[in-house]
Swiss-Prot record:
Full protein name: T-lymphocyte activation antigen CD80
Function: Costimulatory molecule that belongs to the immunoglobulin superfamily that plays an important role in T-lymphocyte activation. Acts as the primary auxiliary signal augmenting the MHC/TCR signal in naive T-cells together with the CD28 receptor which is constitutively expressed on the cell surface of T-cells. In turn, activates different signaling pathways such as NF-kappa-B or MAPK leading to the production of different cytokines. In addition, CD28/CD80 costimulatory signal stimulates glucose metabolism and ATP synthesis of T-cells by activating the PI3K/Akt signaling pathway.
Record note on quaternary structure: Homodimer. Interacts with CTLA4; this interaction inhibits T-cell activation. Interacts with PDL1/CD274; this interaction blocks PDL1/PDCD1 binding and thus PDL1/CD274 inhibitory function. Interacts with CD28.
Organismal lineage: Eukaryota, Metazoa, Chordata, Craniata, Vertebrata
Topological region Extracellular: 33-243
Glycoprotein among keywords: yes
Signal sequence, renumbered to the chain: 1-32
Keyword Secreted attributed: no
Organism: Oryctolagus cuniculus (Rabbit)
Transmembrane segments: 244-264
GO biological process entries: cell surface receptor signaling pathway; cellular response to lipopolysaccharide; immune response; negative regulation of T cell proliferation; positive regulation of T cell proliferation; T cell costimulation
GO cellular component: a single term: external side of plasma membrane
Pfam families from the UniProt entry: C2-set_2 (PF08205), V-set (PF07686)
Keywords, alphabetical: Cell membrane, Disulfide bond, Glycoprotein, Immunoglobulin domain, Membrane, Receptor, Signal, Transmembrane, Transmembrane helix
């Protein structure tokens, strides 16, 4: 036979315990929600444990940071221990929500990190707090660089496009007017330590035409590109193809120059002849004998 509780009647002890347990589980659920942090390679990440603690409380607490069930860092009785993979680049920020600080991020650092806080009560440690943080690592390729590497033939130029330091594996394509061009010497390399990729490719094109060539690098859902513009060299037209308004002044200038040069030459020749004639006259006068006929007859 069922019983009905009157208003104001206190709940049985078992119901109190059930309610307390439900509230505790609800609190644990909300405190263990997974937050997201996204950073780039070589940057610093701060993963918050979302739990405030004073320096004086450290002696009675145990704090564990682990990644995918593997230990990263622990604080026991105030002593910090860092596991080998994270040494010299990982430390706790105790006064800032027990955050885990990771320097010089690597691709291998991506994953879910869990912070566990245990408190000493009556000689035994029980879990006081639990939270998780998912760390995503981006490795973006920079804008590729395009360099001139020579002329395989007189009318052919070769260029190279390259970029490094990105992830995941890239694909490089040369494009012009929406169509992919035929590349040469395309290489993709991955650094075994950092897992980052490098890519380079070369392209030959005819220098007698204008071009707007695009080097496109796709990696995952992202892409970067660089444009290489080329204008064909300007050639001077033959003289017989010059427009008349250019030919007439040029021809007039040439004729005028020729006339001036001819006049100067004639003037120079005339002056030279006159000088020569004067020199000959002076020489003749010096060589002629003195006439003495009248003097001899008078004797």
């Amino acid at each position: 036979m069922g019983h009905t509780l009157r208003p104001g009647t206190p709940l049985p002890r078992c119901l109190h315990l059930k309610l307390c347990l439900l509230l505790a589980l609800a609190g644990l659920h909300f405190s263990s929600g997974i937050s997201q942090v996204t950073k780039s390679v070589k940057e610093m990440a701060a993963l918050s444990c979302d739990y405030n603690i004073s320096i004086d409380e450290l002696a009675r607490m145990r704090i564990y940071w682990q990644k995918d069930q593997q230990m990263v860092l622990s604080i026991i009785s105030g002593q910090v221990e860092v596991w080998p993979e994270y040494k010299n680049r990982t430390f706790p920020d105790i006064i800032n929500n027990l955050s885990l600080m990771i320097l010089a991020l690597r691709l291998s650092d991506k994953g879910t990190y869990t912070c566990v806080v245990q408190k000493n009560e009556n000689g035994s440690f029980r879990r006081e707090h639990l939270t998780s943080v998912t760390l995503s690592i981006r490795a973006d390729f920079p804008v590729p660089s395009i360099t001139d590497i020579g002329h395989p033939d007189p009318n052919v130029k070769r260029i190279r496009c390259s970029a490094s330091g990105g992830f995941p594996e890239p694909r490089l394509a040369w494009m012009e007017d929406g169509e992919e061009l035929n590349a040469v010497n395309t290489t993709v390399d991955q650094d075994l330590d950092t897992e980052l990729y490098s890519v380079s490719s070369e392209l030959d094109f005819n220098v007698t035409n204008n071009h707007s060539i695009v080097c496109l690098i796709k990696y995952g859902e992202l892409s970067v590109s660089q444009i290489f513009p080329w204008s064909k060299p300007k050639q001077e037209p033959p003289i017989d193809q010059l427009p008349f308004w250019v030919i007439i002044p040029v021809s007039g200038a040439l004729v005028l120059t020729a006339v001036v040069l001819y006049c100067l030459a004639c003037r120079h020749v005339a002056r030279w002849k006159r000088t020569r004639r004067n020199e000959e006259t002076v020489g003749t006068e010096r060589l002629s004998p003195i006439y003495l006929g009248s003097a001899q007859s008078s004797g």
